[in-house]
Swiss-Prot record:
Keywords: Methylation, Ribonucleoprotein, Ribosomal protein, RNA-binding, rRNA-binding, tRNA-binding. Belongs to the universal ribosomal protein uS12 family. Part of the 30S ribosomal subunit. Contacts proteins S8 and S17. May interact with IF1 in the 30S initiation complex. With S4 and S5 plays an important role in translational accuracy. The modification 3-methylthioaspartic acid is found at residue 89. It comes from Beijerinckia indica subsp. indica (strain ATCC 9039 / DSM 1715 / NCIMB 8712). This is Small ribosomal subunit protein uS12. GO terms for cellular component: small ribosomal subunit. Pfam families: Ribosom_S12_S23. GO terms for biological process: translation. InterPro entries: NA-bd_OB-fold, Ribosomal_uS12, Ribosomal_uS12_bac. PANTHER family: 30S RIBOSOMAL PROTEIN S12 FAMILY MEMBER. GO terms for molecular function: rRNA binding; structural constituent of ribosome; tRNA binding.
Length: 123
């Protein structure tokens, strides 16, 4: 416990808050261009081939974004929109790619939670 004179000499400092999606620069979404589209495997108890893309954002940052849903049409040079939101079992993946926006198509034959996957209302 510091004395009063020690606190006068060197006051307490507020702990710096670490942003979760810092490359978005306080924006809800950002546009970017895919530089590499590939699959990766998740952390220990899980097993799958998760689809991810390395994206160069308009502000110059390069981030890894997760491609949600079944099947996608992304390839190198596709223009995508990303949002914040990490994938718990993929280290380093802190962003999601939005489906149904710009070059990314929505998920086909999606009946529930369609707005999350950019799917149109079925007839």
């Amino acid at each position: 416990m510091p004395t009063i004179s020690q606190l006068i000499r060197k006051p307490r400092h507020e702990k710096a808050y670490r942003e979760k999606a810092r490359h978005l620069e306080a924006c809800p979404q950002k546009r970017g261009v895919c530089t590499r589209v590939y699959t990766t495997t998740p952390k220990k108890p899980n097993s799958a081939l998760r689809k991810v893309a390395k994206v160069r954002l308009t502000n110059g940052f390069e981030v890894i974004g997760y491609i949600p849903g079944e099947g996608h049409n992304l390839q190198e040079h596709s223009v995508v929109m990303i949002r914040g939101g990490r994938v718990k079992d993929l280290p380093g993946v802190r962003y999601h790619i939005l489906r149904g926006v710009l070059d990314t198509q929505g998920v086909k034959n999606r009946k529930q939670r369609r707005s999350k996957y950019g799917a149109k209302r079925p007839k």
